[in-house]
């Protein structure tokens, strides 16, 4: 992958799961049951990213009905759409982060960068679709 000239917007997943500001700790814990999920994106009805919540943010929270948004943060978890993919890749490896929300200049959520477990590149829409289709269906 030629990351030098590419931007975050060119590689981001464009339809990441979004959670409303009313999402609770318990709801996000349930979302994190999927081991491929590393971050929950809390997004206002107008599309503005309010928080990025990671597992460690809620690990010690004893109140399952607590609103989750105040437990997350944006700093260090977002990148601008025009950011150099090579620079973002280096920063994610240096910090150990595998997810970064991609935002517009005014804070709207545009997408999500998902660093592969191999750390050699980013997941594509096709990768995510294939993984979803390969999951067994649970019948109740």
Tell where the protein language model's regions lie, with residue ranges.
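Tandem CBS (Bateman) regulatory domains
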Residues: 1-15, 49-97, 105-140
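Acidic (E/D-rich), amphipathic helical modules within compact regulatory domains
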Residues: 17-61, 69
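Sensor-regulatory modules in signal-transduction proteins
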Residues: 42, 102-103
């Amino acid at each position: 992958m030629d990351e030098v000239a590419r931007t975050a917007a060119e590689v981001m997943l464009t339809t990441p799961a979004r959670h409303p500001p009313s999402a609770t700790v318990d709801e996000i814990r349930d979302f994190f049951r999927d081991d491929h999920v590393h971050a929950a994106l809390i997004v206002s009805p107008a599309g503005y990213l309010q928080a990025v919540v990671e597992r460690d943010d809620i690990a010690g929270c004893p109140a399952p009905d607590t609103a989750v948004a105040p437990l997350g943060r944006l700093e260090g978890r977002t990148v601008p759409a025009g950011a150099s993919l090579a620079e973002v890749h280096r920063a994610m490896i240096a910090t150990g982060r595998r997810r970064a929300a991609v935002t517009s200049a005014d804070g709207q959520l545009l997408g999500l960068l998902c660093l592969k477990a191999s750390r050699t590149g980013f997941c594509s829409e096709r990768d995510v679709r294939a993984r979803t289709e390969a999951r067994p269906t649970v019948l109740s």
